[in-house]
Amino acid sequence: MTKYIFVTGGVVSSLGKGITASSLGRLLKNRGLKVTMQKFDPYINIDPGTMSPYQHGEVYVTEDGTEADLDLGHYERIVDVRTSKYSNVTTGKIYQEVLEKERRGDYNGATVQVIPHITDMIKKKIMRAALTTDSDVIISEIGGTVGDMESTPFMEAIRQMRREVGEENVMYIHCTLVPLLHAAHEMKTKPTQHSVAELRSIGIQPNMLVLRAEQPIDQEHKNKISTFTDVPVDRIIESIDAPSLFDVPLAFQKQGMDQKVCDFLHIDSPKPEADMEAWKKLDDRAKNLKHHTKITLVGKYVELEDAYISVTDALQHAGYLYNTKIDVDKVQAEDITEDNIAKIMEGSDGLIVPGGFGTRGLEGMITAIKYARENDIPFLGICLGMQMASVEFARDILNLEDANTTEAEPHCKNNIIDIMADKRDEENIGGTLRLGLYPAALKKGTKTREAYGDQDVIQERHRHRFEFNNKYREAFEKAGMVFSGVSPDNHLVEIIELPKKKFFIAAQYHPEFLSRPQRPEGLFKSFIGAASGLPEQEF
């Protein structure tokens, strides 16, 4: 029987529910259990695909082409599992499916209401994740905080789950904040008490508390919280601010969190305890890196940390392999000119230009890429970065001064980058991109193929609607550009490289989505190797 763990939050947002859920998932997985992660978002958008990165941060893409919350990236990187369309559900998606059923007459004329129709659809999504993955444990994170109007249907649905699948198969974990008043040097438990009271008022008694705090919580405060919340003191877990993300699962294990979860849910795991030795080595390496490598990231959304979270994480993952800390210098593409690019790139060991949409900042990206190419600075382009590298090459090497992408200039004469043929007639923006996992055949003798361990074909995740225009392929090849990765039918250009450069590779896909702390993605690994000039150092 699948076990269901629901992670909720109270007091304030951004408490680290996703990290808590991921850390627990890692511990349970390392006990030999099959774990599936799930995130419920209470916003009315169908998915985050059309949301501004400044509003939502990065849009994560799953293998099956779902545009999802960035927390799914945390799940995949920390737990090392693959997520799917069942892993991210929004209020908008729930209402859309319910209304479609109503229009088809599936409800036989019934009055469609939040209870039972919306809550039933939410429960269906939870159980569908269990059925499609055959998992031992489903960990579902509920976005927002307890008491939010938007979260009410999700809270009601998970309350009903206890009756649907049996109390012995459901566990509620509630994350709250225990603030420290610096002036009084005193921790306050009242916010936690009120948050749990709010949760209990809708019929959910938490079975475990995870307390976010700046410093360790003494036994007296834990006893007080236990008394007021009716949660046994041994199931009150501290989540202290940590210097490294990798510390969190280890801190939870030290407090016996995974064992307490297994005991509560009567789980007999294949392994008596989580084997975290490899994780400890990773944590030790991350804290004691011996070198520094500076990478300049030129992007459109650099003001928001979360906008490129998978990219910056992938850079760090590669850095661990070379025992070097990656110092990422984020530069707003709009601010770059021919006059200041040399100053911006001063002391930089490499340039990365990640994905994005729209026309803003494109000329700055092109200027940065040109500087990297002419000065043989290792360069990695991703999605839009690959497209701008192609435009730069056409302008400066092929002397096609008006070369551009039709995203920026719809009627340009030399449309090096053009909209994909099957996307021309799409009227909607949302859900109309080339999304998900696609194969790329790698050319022998290229640095790209070497980066991927001499594989013939790789599978990578995409999110774009524009592509390289094939009518320019011959001219590019004659000028020295190598198309080192193409679709198996040779129709779509997936990877370009300049073989005479130290490292100049750009991919149409998003390699950052497949990077893991203990398994850096191939292009990132080779890019940091070239930028740092260091040998690999296994750990």
Curated annotation (Swiss-Prot):
Q: Which Gene Ontology cellular component terms are annotated?
A: cytosol
Q: List the disulfide bonds.
A: none
The annotated region (Amidoligase domain) lies at 1-267
Which residues does the record give as UTP binding sites?
13, 188-193, 224
Q: What positions belong to coiled-coil segments? A: none
This entry's Enzyme Commission designation comes to 6.3.4.2
Give the EC class as a word: ligase
Residues that bind Mg(2+): 71, 141
* Pfam families assigned: CTP_synth_N, GATase
Regulation of this protein's activity per its record: Allosterically activated by GTP, when glutamine is the substrate; GTP has no effect on the reaction when ammonia is the substrate. The allosteric effector GTP functions by stabilizing the protein conformation that binds the tetrahedral intermediate(s) formed during glutamine hydrolysis. Inhibited by the product CTP, via allosteric rather than competitive inhibition.
Record-annotated active site? 383, 510, 512
Extract the InterPro entries matched here.
Class_I_gatase-like, CTP_synthase, CTP_synthase_N, GATASE, GATase1_CTP_Synthase, P-loop_NTPase
One further remark on this entry is:
CTPSs have evolved a hybrid strategy for distinguishing between UTP and CTP. The overlapping regions of the product feedback inhibitory and substrate sites recognize a common feature in both compounds, the triphosphate moiety. To differentiate isosteric substrate and product pyrimidine rings, an additional pocket far from the expected kinase/ligase catalytic site, specifically recognizes the cytosine and ribose portions of the product inhibitor.
The job of this chain, per UniProt, is described as: Catalyzes the ATP-dependent amination of UTP to CTP with either L-glutamine or ammonia as the source of nitrogen. Regulates intracellular CTP levels through interactions with the four ribonucleotide triphosphates.
Cite the HAMAP family for this sequence.
PyrG
Descriptive protein name: CTP synthase
Question: In the UniProt record, what gene is named as encoding this protein?
Answer: pyrG
